[in-house]
Amino acid sequence: MVSFKVSLVSTSPIDGQKPGTSGLRKKVKVFKQPNYLENFVQATFNALTTEKVKGATLVVSGDGRYYSEQAIQIIVKMAAANGVRRVWVGQNSLLSTPAVSAIIRERVGADGSKATGAFILTASHNPGGPTEDFGIKYNMENGGPAPESITDKIYENTKTIKEYPIAEDLPRVDISTIGITSFEGPEGKFDVEVFDSADDYVKLMKSIFDFESIKKLLSYPKFTFCYDALHGVAGAYAHRIFVEELGAPESSLLNCVPKEDFGGGHPDPNLTYAKELVARMGLSKTDDAGGEPPEFGAAADGDADRNMILGKRFFVTPSDSVAIIAANAVGAIPYFSSGLKGVARSMPTSAALDVVAKNLGLKFFEVPTGWKFFGNLMDAGMCSVCGEESFGTGSDHIREKDGIWAVLAWLSILAHKNKETLDGNAKLVTVEDIVRQHWATYGRHYYTRYDYENVDATAAKELMGLLVKLQSSLPEVNKIIKGIHPEVANVASADEFEYKDPVDGSVSKHQGIRYLFEDGSRLVFRLSGTGSEGATIRLYIEQYEKDASKIGRDSQDALGPLVDVALKLSKMQEFTGRSSPTVIT
């Protein structure tokens, strides 16, 4: 058995190491600076209680982006020096963020060990490569991201750090070969176990979904399927789940070989960046893939926690997706057969889920943006299904959003709706059919998001200030609105969203400005990133339509009057100098 020594390395604080819920994300060249990664890792160890470090088991893996392998070798050496008993690493450093959450919660080592936390190496949907982004975040023993109480401690520690211990003579660990490597250190034995990236996650998915019914759907000649991993870590699971377990043809997988630079692309599953899938599904305005599009398509981001769902020539909004999953979960997904504990969405997400909750008599929660708020509700047994408009959907099986889970949920719903079709020769119920039937039952929430990026920070704050000031006089607001578009409904209430967590009582203020209309429509304004590169203003526009004869309109056409009201009420062009947004979703 190879032995190692521990040495103390002197260091000094490095500015700008403040982690968010999504951890610390910077350019690779920043992480490669002397002591940059080491300082942050040690600051994290110092923020944890002793029993979470000494003698503990930690998971260290990520989405496989550039610099991951070097980072893992450094973290392993520091874990050994800090008295960690064992480190679990996904083969070739690959573990999706949802899989890490599942492994913390579910995996038991051969010696009975359970993980107390994880370092996840990802910058999510940000590009990867030598000149692009790297990231690191810490997840706790519940499988969820570190709460602010921990991330605040980490940040404080980065401002005072003077030294860190490291086992510099620990040999490089071969993370490409499955097995356990044991070492002997000053505090005793230290193991590094490299294991199959997919086994634990696949086992969990098979306990949630009826794989046989999905397999039957995928084998049906008229049902075609396409999945695009955008060269992210989802590729490590896609072949195993969709091809080996469910019998889909290999040709149904796009970009499913994980690459450290994501093939030079932007691993963000939306209509802009998942170009190849969008073209194949018949939704591209410029690129025709040729042939008949598949019936179902889906994409993932770099670390596989986000998802985009598509039908043939049909886009499912994330807001509709979570509502449809919640409405069909009990009948279509065995895990939910005894009922849902509750549902939740982030505040900017459309109110489609609210209508489902009201109709089905479910507990409903509206939370600020950030998955940790869902995690609190789930830990307390109050929420089963949740989602956000930024392509994140999940359930209480783990404490992260889960892209492949969302795909399997949709395939389960399709299999459930097509039971009779698969047994006979009836017409296939499509993704579009399911969405339109949902709208016919619950009404449609027309929805769009306008992003104004790199706006002057002062001007952005002034715009938000105007919107807060207007809220003090709703008669004046309604007078302005009638002058812009008389047919738009009156504003019933307006506020700045504030959330009191029903679990721990914590209060989150200034989470966005809301204008709520009498007909269920909403305008939401949020400000983010007031840094040196300016601010981003996000404008969310939503209109509720119950009239079945009006639910088939083009979204931008239906929202036209409300968009006009939002832009003129906020004086968007006057404050920003922009005649159009940077991005429309």
Curated annotation (Swiss-Prot):
Xref: PROSITE patterns: PGM_PMM
Region annotated Disordered, chain positions: 1-20
Location in the cell: Cytoplasm
GO CC terms: cytoplasm
Binding sites annotated in the UniProt record for alpha-D-glucose 1,6-bisphosphate: R25, S124, D305, R306, T369, E388, S390, K401
CDD domains: PGM1
Pfam families (UniProt xref): PGM1_C_vert_fung, PGM_PMM_I, PGM_PMM_II, PGM_PMM_III
EC number, UniProt record: 5.4.2.2
Any one GO BP annotation for this protein: glucose metabolic process
Cofactor(s) the protein needs: Mg(2+)
Top EC group: isomerase
Keywords: Carbohydrate metabolism, Cytoplasm, Glucose metabolism, Isomerase, Magnesium, Metal-binding, Phosphoprotein
Keyword Methyltransferase: no
GO molecular function: magnesium ion binding; phosphoglucomutase activity
Sequence positions that bind Mg(2+): S124, D301, D303, D305
Active site location: S124 (phosphoserine intermediate)
Reaction catalyzed: alpha-D-glucose 1-phosphate = alpha-D-glucose 6-phosphate; O-phospho-L-seryl-[protein] + alpha-D-glucose 1-phosphate = alpha-D-glucose 1,6-bisphosphate + L-seryl-[protein]; alpha-D-glucose 1,6-bisphosphate + L-seryl-[protein] = O-phospho-L-seryl-[protein] + alpha-D-glucose 6-phosphate
Cofactor remark: Binds 1 Mg(2+) ion per subunit.
Phosphoserine sites (modified residues): S124
Keyword Phosphoprotein: yes
Major localisation: cytoplasm
NCBIfam families assigned to the protein according to its UniProt record, in alphabetical order: PRK07564.1-1 (NF005737)
Subunit details: Monomer.
Job description of the protein: Catalyzes the reversible isomerization of alpha-D-glucose 1-phosphate to alpha-D-glucose 6-phosphate. The mechanism proceeds via the intermediate compound alpha-D-glucose 1,6-bisphosphate. This enzyme participates in both the breakdown and synthesis of glucose.
Record family assignment: Belongs to the phosphohexose mutase family.
UniProt protein name: Probable phosphoglucomutase, cytoplasmic 2
